[in-house]
Amino acid sequence: SLFELGKMILQETGKNPAKSYGAYGCNCGVLGRGKPKEATQRCCYVHKCCYKKLTGCDPKKDRYSYSW
């Protein structure tokens, strides 16, 4: 879910995900679209492309476990 993604961003970067990336560049956030212009935007773009390919679930809402 977006909640787990936000937790990962906070753990990895120490940044508030909504404030730091909610409307970042052309691909991060709800309305993001267009060609990525740098690495962070590319990450958001790849993440959104991955979400679009999933079927049988709602990756923005379904919860999951993770570790690293």
Curated annotation (Swiss-Prot):
Record-linked SMART domains: PA2c
Tissues and organs where the protein is expressed, per its UniProt entry: Expressed by the venom gland.
PANTHER family: PHOSPHOLIPASE A2 FAMILY MEMBER, PHOSPHOLIPASE A2, MEMBRANE ASSOCIATED
Localization per record: Secreted
Keyword check for NADP: no
Keyword line: Disulfide bond, Myotoxin, Secreted, Toxin
SUPFAM superfamilies reported in the protein's UniProt record: Phospholipase A2, PLA2
Function recorded in the entry: Snake venom phospholipase A2 (PLA2) that lacks enzymatic activity. Is myotoxic, induces edema, and causes systemic effects (renal changes that lead to proteinuria) on mice. A model of myotoxic mechanism has been proposed: an apo Lys49-PLA2 is activated by the entrance of a hydrophobic molecule (e.g. fatty acid) at the hydrophobic channel of the protein leading to a reorientation of a monomer.
Protein name (record): Basic phospholipase A2 homolog BdipTx-I
One Gene Ontology MF term: calcium-dependent phospholipase A2 activity
GO CC terms, sorted: extracellular region
Stored PROSITE patterns: PA2_HIS (PS00118)
Pfam families tied to this protein: Phospholip_A2_1
Family: Belongs to the phospholipase A2 family. Group II subfamily. K49 sub-subfamily.
One GO BP annotation of this record: phospholipid metabolic process
